Amino acid sequence: MTAEGHAYARFQRALEHRALWAAEDAARELQLSLHDALRLVHLYADRRSPKFERAALRWLERYLAESSPRLQSVAEVTASLARREHEAGEPI
């Protein structure tokens, strides 16, 4: 397994076990896809991490740059992230 493959396997395991520190550690070694970055943002919310808001805003920037979404989609995604900050323990 390549170093990146190993890091991705660790990232996946960390998400499954809701291990924030391990997920962050593995993510530093990867170029996360938009989907995986969102999974990390949700883990921040679940753990009520003070990093949640900044991570959510950075994810929104990537979403806008990489997806070319319609305005309605941007509004829905933004509202969903804002709600997510106040919900804890729900599955990703």
How would you label these PLM feature ranges?
Residues 1-92:
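Long, low-complexity, acidic Ser/Pro- and Gly-enriched intrinsically disordered regions
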